Amino acid sequence: MWQQADPDEILQRAWTVGLPMRTRFRGVTLREAMLIQGPAGWGEFAPFPEYGAEESAAWLKAGLEAAWSGLGEPLRGEIPVNATMPAVGPGQVEQVLRRFGELEAIPAVKIKVAEPGVGSFEESLAKDLARVREVRRLVPQAGLRVDANGGWTQEQALRALDALAEVAGESFEYAEQPVAGVETLAQLREELARRGVGIAGNPLRIAADEAVRKAEDPLRVARLGAADLIVVKVPPLGGVTKALRIVEDSGLDAVVSSALDTSVGLSAGLALAARLPKLPYACGLGTAALFEQDVVEQPLIPAGGVLPVPGATRAGEAEAGQAEAARMTAPSPSSSLVEAHRLPADREAWWRSRLREAHHALTGAARI
């Protein structure tokens, strides 16, 4: 059990890496992560640098669960996956989309909007509309969802979503975290319905992300009726087991998304998606396509709009008695790729210290 693993034991089988991004994403150009090997396989510890020990503790718990306890048994062998569009100009949209496979096979696209530092609200919105318009032109069959990361005020969100709904048309699936905070999100959802902002006579659907993963009470969104669905990410929620429980208790549809993980970390997201009883939306688990290179020989990059679940039994095998129930595992990192992307000594020391601090916060131990 991961609870019995002490920091010294964990760090004996841990490696730190930095993966260059093809395009800046949420301000990140080099994604740093710590890979952890345990009795059941591999896990990942990769909270963003600005996160403190308390917030990072959940990420450590998720990584230890994967490495010490495994990822569980899947209900499905492949996961539909959306493309992810950073806040790029229209001229770069096609190049980014093609990293996710053949354009006609892409089932959905998540489009970043409300990017900080790009001018006034009006200037930012104009760029967002141009980006969405180009995505719709290139992949007319794909569902479109926008993600503002809570970057708008309520009035800005009302204006922006009205304009975006007009551009996206019936392809518009939902808006993810348009405003920060649970109460504000609930008020926005109510006001959008009152104003009739929506698609084909239906209110625009709202998805909660930060209001779930950064909240002390991740179920408050559901109780307040603040969202139509939730976006769940395994690392900040503390692992697959806890994320499954949150989805079940919320009673809402869920979209499983990544936290800009390497293919090792993405495996936990795939495991969650594979274990959910229902999966009505394509998941945001194709983000390995945003890296220049990964830590595994065969990165988890979608083909034909889907990702296979690592370790899952092929369809029909278990029913025919040809295979035992599959246990999902993360792909093993390549030693040569890990060495090629290994962080310098000072950054490695910083990560090792950070793991100890997160472990202390996780276990409540008096001394590490």
Feature locations, PLM:
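Catalytic domains of carbohydrate-active enzymes, especially glycoside hydrolases
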Residues: 42-45, 96-117
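Electropositive phosphate-/nucleotide-binding environments in soluble metabolic enzymes
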Residues: 28, 50-58, 87-90, 122-125, ...
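Active-site mouth loops of central-metabolism enzymes
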Residues: 17-30, 78-94, 113-123, 150-155, ...
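Conserved N-terminal beta1-alpha1 strand-loop-helix module at the mouth
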Residues: 22-79, 129
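Solvent-exposed alpha-helices and their adjacent loops that cap or buttress functional pockets
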Residues: 27-28, 73-75, 100-103, 137-138, ...
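Catalytic core of soluble alpha/beta enzymes
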Residues: 111, 116-271, 293-295
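Flexible C-terminal active-site loop/helix
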Residues: 1-15, 19-31, 42, 46, ...
